[in-house]
């Protein structure tokens, strides 16, 4: 039975067990991930994040082909042990973990490329947290019908890809949002082959204040269940509401989640429109746990 040195971290309540494995020698089983994330018998988290040198694993070497400066790879695993392409909250906490453990230097205002299964993502340190360029986004997955427990009727959703798949559903009120039981995975028709995160979103009234769009949301994450926050989900929700609102909709958004507030912005680049995410990150405590 080996010991694992870990750090518990969180971003707007989306929490993770992080550990450094530069040489790529610690390959957790699905059962071990589930045990670490168990909130009653383990540490408790929405997922695990391994910091591994990109050169030491195949997915990381693919990131180096994209950007030779992407020295570190974020190996994210969901509660059930399945690998995830990307985590918008996780990558901010991951970057802070690298800084605090002396694995990188990143003064405020500077940017570091991080390898993920969705490709390389650039993370900039700011005075109050981190900003992440999530890259190009796309309408993907069509408009499946979404059935969520305790919502009376099926609702049309909108498929959005921001490096991982999402389906966004607009609701009419915060009361309706509160009624939904996201302990159960919403049912999608048709069901995406790889599954999807599902966001239930309520636009504010008024929607736009001082040029910034405002929305409130909850999320059920594929492989993890309902979480207090989902960074890529916040980006997908803002993109969907902007799409539905039309040409007059803003490119800056404030997204209220149960765990806090995230900022989302859309901006042009040479390879198309990108979406960015901003928010806090915190390392909560360090520890050692025995791996079964």
Curated annotation (Swiss-Prot):
| Keyword tags | Amino-acid biosynthesis, Cytoplasm, Isomerase, Lysine biosynthesis
**Protein residues bound to substrate:** 14, 78, 88-89, 164, 197, 221-222, 231-232
Q: Where is this site: Could be important to modulate the pK values of the two catalytic cysteine residues?
A: 166, 221
Q: Name one GO molecular function term.
A: diaminopimelate epimerase activity
Offer one Pfam family short name for this entry.
DAP_epimerase
**An example of a Gene Ontology BP annotation on this entry?**
lysine biosynthetic process via diaminopimelate
Principal subcellular localization: cytoplasm
Q: Where is the active site?
A: 87, 230
Organism's domain of life? Bacteria
Location in the cell: Cytoplasm
Pathway of action: Amino-acid biosynthesis; L-lysine biosynthesis via DAP pathway; DL-2,6-diaminopimelate from LL-2,6-diaminopimelate: step 1/1
EC id: 5.1.1.7
Annotated TM spans: none
Q: Which reaction(s) are listed as its catalytic activity?
A: (2S,6S)-2,6-diaminopimelate = meso-2,6-diaminopimelate
Q: Which GO terms describe its cellular component?
A: cytosol
Q: Which HAMAP family match?
A: DAP_epimerase
Q: Which family does it belong to?
A: Belongs to the diaminopimelate epimerase family.
> What do we know about how this protein assembles, alone or with others?
Homodimer.
According to its UniProt entry, the function of this protein is described as: Catalyzes the stereoinversion of LL-2,6-diaminopimelate (L,L-DAP) to meso-diaminopimelate (meso-DAP), a precursor of L-lysine and an essential component of the bacterial peptidoglycan.
Its protein name is Diaminopimelate epimerase
């Amino acid at each position: 039975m080996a010991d694992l040195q870990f750090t518990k971290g969180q971003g707007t309540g989306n929490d993770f067990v992080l550990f450094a494995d530069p040489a790529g020698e610690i390959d957790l089983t699905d059962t071990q991930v589930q045990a670490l994330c168990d909130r009653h018998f383990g540490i408790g988290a929405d997922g695990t994040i391994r910091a591994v040198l990109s050169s030491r694993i195949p997915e990381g070497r693919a990131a180096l082909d994209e950007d030779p400066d992407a020295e570190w790879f974020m190996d994210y695993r969901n509660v059930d042990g399945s690998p995830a392409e990307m985590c918008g909250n996780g990558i901010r906490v991951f970057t802070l973990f690298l800084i605090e453990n002396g694995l990188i230097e990143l003064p405020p205002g500077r940017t570091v490329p991080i390898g993920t299964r969705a490709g390389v993502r650039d993370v900039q340190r700011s005075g109050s947290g981190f900003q992440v360029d999530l890259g190009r986004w796309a309408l993907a997955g069509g408009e499946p019908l979404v059935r969520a427990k305790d919502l009376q009727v099926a609702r049309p959703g909108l498929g959005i890809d921001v490096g991982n798949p999402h389906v966004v559903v607009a609701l009419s009120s915060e009361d309706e949002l509160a009624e939904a039981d996201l302990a159960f995975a919403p049912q999608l028709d048709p069901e995406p082959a790889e599954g999807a995160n599902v966001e239930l979103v309520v636009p504010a009234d008024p929607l736009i204040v001082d040029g910034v769009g405002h929305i409130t949301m909850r999320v059920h994450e594929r492989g993890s269940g309902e979480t207090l926050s989902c960074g890529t989900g916040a980006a997908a929700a803002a993109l969907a509401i902007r799409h539905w609102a039309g040409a007059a909709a803003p490119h800056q958004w404030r997204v209220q989640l149960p765990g806090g507030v995230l900022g989302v912005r859309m901006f042009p680049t040479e390879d198309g429109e990108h979406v960015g995410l901003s928010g806090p990150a915190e390392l909560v405590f360090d520890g050692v746990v025995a791996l079964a």
